[in-house]
Amino acid sequence: MVSVQINDNESIDKMLKRFKKKYERAGVLKEFRANAYFVKPSVDGRLKRSRSRRRAQRANEERNS
């Protein structure tokens, strides 16, 4: 669980900014979305392979541009 203590003379905005940064780095939202519903292992592997291919194509296009 992500928690942040407010420091002396620190504004709420700065504290919120620190919280958001910790929240993103911890991957809470990403993990929640990944576990929102069950995906069969075969489908999960297929999706990962297709994402990997797209990422490789984009990287290759950027190198050739």
Swiss-Prot record:
Record-linked InterPro entries: Ribosomal_bS21, Ribosomal_bS21_sf
Domain of life: Bacteria
Ribosomal protein is among the record's keywords: yes
Residue span of region Disordered: 45-65
GO cellular component terms given for this protein: ribonucleoprotein complex; ribosome
GO annotation, biological process: translation
Keywords, comma-separated and alphabetical: Ribonucleoprotein, Ribosomal protein
GO molecular function, one term: structural constituent of ribosome
Compositionally biased residues, Basic residues: 48-57
Record flagged with keyword Transferase: no
Family: Belongs to the bacterial ribosomal protein bS21 family.
HAMAP family: Ribosomal_bS21 (MF_00358)
Protein name listed in UniProt: Small ribosomal subunit protein bS21
Lineage of source species: Bacteria, Pseudomonadati, Chlorobiota, Chlorobiia, Chlorobiales
Encoding gene (name): rpsU
